[in-house]
Amino acid sequence: MLFYKHLYATDTEGHTDMKGRYWKIAAVCAVVALSTAALWQGLQTTHYTLVSPHLEKPVRFAVVTDLHSTWYGENQSELVGAIEREHPDAVLLSGDIVDDKEPRDAAKAFLETIAQKYPTYYVLGNHEFRTPDPEEVKDWTRNLGVTVLDGTGETVTLNDQTVLICGTDDPACGIADFQNQFFAVSRMAQQTDAFTVLLSHRPELTDWYTDAGFDLVVSGHAHGGQVRLPLVMSNGLIAPGQGLFPKYTTGLHELEDTTLLVSRGLCRNWLPRVCNRPELVILDATL
């Protein structure tokens, strides 16, 4: 009987130890899996729809922002391929495509390739203005076939729909220049019945965008708030120009008669993005 009890006790203790080891292994695996998912940097395509009375035909825009000279495959094949699969009518670039500290090769490869395929519109962000010569960035970008907007706009036909696409330099160009550019494009928007789009890098300038006459404002800059925790920090932890717990980091936001679209952007060169995959945004503007 004593021998049986000893065997039983040994077996029970061994079984308990084995269960404990299993739980520890499972916990480690869960932590690794969750960490991998949270830090995954794979490109995501996000779709939004905007309904506007100023449209008679639908128009599809691909929005690319905050690339920061990041590579997405050889010759940017991953990013370009993702855009091609969506068949946009135009590509909108809302700043920081070129980075002031990274080589320009990645930005040039993307701009040159995409401009050969789609009408492409570009405004400079704060990082382009940190380069030695922002005007030189505009010049070589235009030479690649990209339309650079700096207090200017173009009325174009996309899918048989008239659209006015305007843009301003980032306020880093100088506040007086930014004001002059913004007032110029706002006057253009208020004098047309067409669907109006403004490319402007910073989403936090909502006081400027409200009642400026644009149906849609497209921005980036916030990098999705960098660290996002579902249900806890859905807008992210921090964003330039907004500080901690920012409001405008992703998605569509109604600003009275204007809709603000914020992309989380594509940079993955710097600080890790947590629960915050880089994104290509596809916006369907429809009647």
Features from the language model and the residues they span:
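Structural motif
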Residues: 59, 90, 163, 195-197, ...
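Extended recognition/assembly regions associated with phosphoester-bond processing machinery
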Residues: 46-52, 187-199, 203, 250-251, ...
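Membrane-embedded segments
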Residues: 57-152
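N-terminal membrane-anchoring alpha-helices
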Residues: 1-55
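Conserved beta-sheet core of the metallophosphoesterase superfamily
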Residues: 203-281
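Catalytic metal-binding/acid-base residues of hydrolase active sites
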Residues: 68, 98, 127-128, 153-154, ...
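Binuclear metal-dependent hydrolase catalytic cores centered on His/Asp/Glu-rich metal-binding motifs
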Residues: 139, 143-146, 158-199, 206-207, ...
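Beta-strand-turn-beta hairpins that frame and shape the catalytic cleft
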Residues: 51-62, 146, 154-166, 193, ...
